[in-house]
């Protein structure tokens, strides 16, 4: 499968992170930290479309500190 362009990929990642933040606000049992780490390790890192620094910046933009 071909890689999608970087701008689209970043948009998808940002939307996913924002959705995770929304879920954390509505579900007190949801572990945002663990899910963010899992998302990075199992999806972002293997796909190698963005760097760790870019991912961390998107986390900040989504409200994950």
Regions found by a protein language model. Give the residues of each.
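N-terminal acidic leader/helix
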Residues: 2-28
